[in-house]
UniProtKB/Swiss-Prot annotation:
This is Serine/threonine-protein kinase SAPK1. GO terms for molecular function: ATP binding; protein serine kinase activity; protein serine/threonine kinase activity. It comes from Oryza sativa subsp. japonica (Rice). ATP binds at I10, G11, S12, G13, N14, F15, G16, V17, A18, K33. Expressed in leaf blades, leaf sheaths and roots. Expressed in shoots and roots of young seedlings.
Amino acid sequence: MERYEVMRDIGSGNFGVAKLVRDVATNHLFAVKFIERGLKIDEHVQREIMNHRSLKHPNIIRFKEVVLTPTHLAIVMEYAAGGELFERICNAGRFSEDEARFFFQQLISGVSYCHSMQVCHRDLKLENTLLDGSVTPRLKICDFGYSKSSVLHSQPKSTVGTPAYIAPEVLSRKEYDGKVADVWSCGVTLYVMLVGAYPFEDPDDPRNFRKTITRILSVQYSIPDYVRVSADCRHLLSRIFVGNPEQRITIPEIKNHPWFLKNLPIEMTDEYQRSMQLADMNTPSQSLEEVMAIIQEARKPGDAMKLAGAGQVACLGSMDLDDIDDIDDIDIENSGDFVCAL
């Protein structure tokens, strides 16, 4: 890590701590996730690194490299100076339909690319979408800790993700198509941008987790009268929030929907995306062999010394619902509750 100068803490969570660093040679800023060496370097960490490494797209946080320190495995990635889309919604209350579409187009562009690379994210939510620092913000999908690749891994069966965003079929604990479940989560993100609340929470009892699950399973949602939403937008949401995953709208169908196509920036078109991907193929990246060797070495316990002064963030990541014995015992503050009440 000699080439990087630590600037400040930018977050913490179940994984460890994240810091903003500066490349002393280029002055470029990066975000680094530090994970303690030893037992914490498990299959989930390896999966996150391998899936993230394979993805190169303008709407996905760019993976740079993994580095080993005496105490930690460091994952170096692009730094998004604009913060979370979640924070932007908290500050705004809700977005206009045009602003929601602007970010939704970018979200779908990134998710479509992930799926084309045979990677399903499985934890799409506002907190896992960052913004760069530009005046016209570019959305960046991050956090591939729960992602699965159909090339590297079996079809998902575990119930992972943030409760408010989980698709009905994921709650069934049977094998499901992670790509189709991602579509549902994108719909929840769109709804929250438009309304400023989660679609399946009871407005009179938003912290009742059991009730939220029941409403998800029965696809019980509505758009409040005070929110003006076009007929095309309502139609798209009604095609996303379909309990039967086989009947749910697909990503290619979303990309052809009239609401999605309205004011679509040229950089969101398939032709432009393909040209960008061809250019990215020539971008050098850390070799697979080097990455795997570093991960294997990181499984060995490091020195007892710990990084000092971990920062704090409001959202500490998602939970795995398979680890929950009684949903009444859940701390709703950290389970996807929309903490910015309107």
